[in-house]
């Protein structure tokens, strides 16, 4: 029962992390730039995401536009788009494996094989965690570097958006969930080892010999 509870907890954390990947990928808040003009009415905030950028006016009005070309994205966001999509696919594969290898499912009968499949699912979730950690941390590094770079104009400096924090949280959940699933070791075989039995040879009475 403890092993089943561990699997359920690991799968739940991994599913939450996978949903976090989708949310981080979809939200246009990877980079946030605030422009404050001389008049507070002209204040606006610019959001940059993987698929679109949005401008939010001080009145609350928001306008979003899809990128015309992938080449218009910075290099880190281009890599982030590819890695995030791959991470979503890998996470979906991990969930499929976790369903097949779950103790509470009847997809397979052999408990040893199911445990090995569950360990594989945990490893897949850990790979998905690394795939999202790389682009999120890379983008955060570039944002911080440009923010403290005196050569970058103040109007072009950016701050880290909510998508980065969601991505870090999703990576942590996937890593923790995958680690819990990897703790599901294959059960020991209940089959007793074969032992040869030897019996002493019976002596033949001498009367049987001619």
Swiss-Prot record:
Cytoplasmic side: 1-7, 103-116, 182-210
Region (Interactions with TJP1, TJP2 and TJP3): 209-210
Segments for region (Interaction with EPHA2): 1-103
Tissue: Expressed primarily in lung and kidney. Present in both cortical and medullar collecting ducts (at protein level).
Any single biological process term in GO: response to progesterone
Single GO term (MF): structural molecule activity
InterPro entries, sorted: Claudin, Claudin4, Claudin_CS, PMP22/EMP/MP20/Claudin
Subcellular location: Cell junction, Tight junction; Cell membrane
Residue intervals annotated with topology Extracellular: 29-81, 138-160
Catalytic activity: chloride(in) = chloride(out); bromide(in) = bromide(out); iodide(out) = iodide(in); fluoride(in) = fluoride(out)
Post-translational modification: Phosphorylated. Phosphorylation by EPHA2 is stimulated by EFNA1 and alters interaction with TJP1.
Membrane topology classification: Multi-pass membrane protein
Disulfide bridge map: 54-64
Domain of life of the organism encoding this protein: Eukaryota
Function as written in the Swiss-Prot or TrEMBL entry: Can associate with other claudins to regulate tight junction structural and functional strand dynamics. May coassemble with CLDN8 into tight junction strands containing anion-selective channels that convey paracellular chloride permeability in renal collecting ducts. May integrate into CLDN3 strands to modulate localized tight junction barrier properties. May disrupt strand assembly of channel-forming CLDN2 and CLDN15 and inhibit cation conductance. Cannot form tight junction strands on its own.
UniProt record similarity statement: Belongs to the claudin family.
Protein name: Claudin-4
Species name: Mus musculus
């Amino acid at each position: 029962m403890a092993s089943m509870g561990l699997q359920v907890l690991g799968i739940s954390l991994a599913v939450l992390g996978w949903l976090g990947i989708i949310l981080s990928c979809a939200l246009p808040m990877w980079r946030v730039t605030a422009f404050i003009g001389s008049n507070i009415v002209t204040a606006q905030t610019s959001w940059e995401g993987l698929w679109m950028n949005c401008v939010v006016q001080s009145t609350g009005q928001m306008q979003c536009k899809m990128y015309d070309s992938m080449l218009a994205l910075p290099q880190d966001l281009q890599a982030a788009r590819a890695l995030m999509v791959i991470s979503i696919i890998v996470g979906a594969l991990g969930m499929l494996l976790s369903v097949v290898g779950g103790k509470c499912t009847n997809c397979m009968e052999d408990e040893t094989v199911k445990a090995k499949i569950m360990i594989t699912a945990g490893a897949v979730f850990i790979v998905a965690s690394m795939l999202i950690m790389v682009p999120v941390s890379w983008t955060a590094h570039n944002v911080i570097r440009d923010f403290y770079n005196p050569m970058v104009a103040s109007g072009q400096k950016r701050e880290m958006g909510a998508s980065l924090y969601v991505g870090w949280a999703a990576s942590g959940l996937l890593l923790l969930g995958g680690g819990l699933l990897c703790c599901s070791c294959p059960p020991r075989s209940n089959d007793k080892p074969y032992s040869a039995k030897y019996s002493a040879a019976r002596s033949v009475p001498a009367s049987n010999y001619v």
